């Protein structure tokens, strides 16, 4: 049912060590990233072996919970979730329930409110994931995945592990090559520019192993990734402005369409599982 057996089989195969962890079924910057640390890096070995790309169509569909009927800025759709979860650990990919913990529109623009809303229940011991989603003024959609809830750490300590990653989604034309060739052969006119269908193209930037600056949050900002004095992604305490730079932790590109500095139009945090 929904290919769940397929996915469970892949988990067993992953545990047995017979699957290929870092598949190229998604777009990443790993080829251009700085050289990874050696295989003795415990921070890296702890997580990357668990990451598997499950075959398309074999995962159960995602259900999004938490949007109010009055919410105007709804940043995610199940189709977008399918793209984002390709880089998650296999067991997290299998969760069908994505629960909205924080929304800039629904809960107000405050980093303190974000931390309060995403704080896990002390009785909850199940392993889950967290997805940060941001929309900028040019309608760019990007964000991050975290293995733990975002929380302030005033001791200048980085948290998180090698499961974390940065990502962005771009709308691109959905071109069917076979249909295009058939149309050209028959001499038919193609669709008008405005009628072209589009799809989401996912670009993921997984942990490189170069450093261990996965997550760093304080009462003044939330950030993921760093190196050479630059943050991969940073949001200020008012959740009004942010910064995105290429960083060593994730080998990422600038995530926002606005450039290295961007304005936050909408922001959400989801719990996966």
UniProtKB/Swiss-Prot annotation:
Residues 18-48, 177-197 are annotated as: Disordered. It comes from the Eukaryota. PROSITE patterns: TLDC (PS51886). The keyword Acetylation applies. GO terms for cellular component: cytoplasm; mitochondrion; nucleus. Keywords: Acetylation, Mitochondrion, Phosphoprotein. It is found in: Mitochondrion. The modification Phosphoserine is found at residue 178. Residues 74-273 form the TLDc domain. Residues 18-33 have a biased composition (Low complexity). The modification N-acetylmethionine is found at residue 1. Induction: Up-regulated by heat and oxidative stress. Residues 37-48 have a biased composition (Basic and acidic residues). One of its GO terms (biological process) is response to oxidative stress. Involved in protection from oxidative damage. Present with 1560 molecules/cell in log phase SD medium. Belongs to the OXR1 family. This is Oxidation resistance protein 1. The gene is OXR1.
